[in-house]
Amino acid sequence: SSDLIYLDGETELEKVKENNQALKRLALRKEEWLKTYQFLLMKAGQTEPLQANHQFTPDAIALLSVFIVEELFKEEEITILEMGSGMGILGATFLTSLDKKVDYLGMEVDDLLIDLAASMADVIGLQAGFVQGDAVRPQMLKESDVVISDLPVGYYPDDAVASRHQVASSQEHTYAHHLLMEQGLKYLKSDGYAIFLAPSDLLTSPQSDLLKGWLKEEASLVAMISLPENLFASAKQSKTIFILQKKSEIAVEPFVYPLASLQDANVLMKFKENFQKWTQGTEI
């Protein structure tokens, strides 16, 4: 069945279980395991290049996302839904680096990637839940504090499913990343935050008028953090972190910040100070 839920790395394959047990005996720390997986996936990608939407979120961006969530939420416990969780690297980064008790659920349509993510979580010893499903289609999910996604970019092939969404195009296939943003907001608590890694030209690209129409009615764009272009294969593929909330009566002055580097400690420190000021309601 396509709706199988894999929790805590459970799987039917005995061989996988045996391999996982052997790996656990190496007794690495969680952070060491995560770095090992990232290294192996990078090496594998050099010999067998991954399609763009299967590549994992770069470590620096994942850690930046952790910082953002730490600043936005002061609570000790937090629920996170990741849409299009892929190999589970972003989720694993939250579970190993976030200084909170995390209830994490990753949703992914690709059964192979789900198996890989669940197996990795099992070996590292992470309490992670995964569900297989098309994140554009409605799912029975509880609302979360955080909905996060490194959005897959491209056209969504099923026009009938797309047509149920406000961002749907009547002229052509609808952008999948627009559909995921609209659907993702439905799983967000009223005071939660949706954090989307999306193309930098999101608000000016084709179909952007449809997206902006939906944004105006249903969401508040509270922050835009553009990422350094050198992180991406080309300037055209550059991405920005867009932070959204459900529409509310309280107007928030958006935080707009061009992040010039993720390697330069001074640049990062300045960004962190500015973001902290913004979250505390201080004029930047």
PLM features per residue range, with description:
Residues 173-230:
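Conserved Class I SAM-dependent methyltransferase catalytic core
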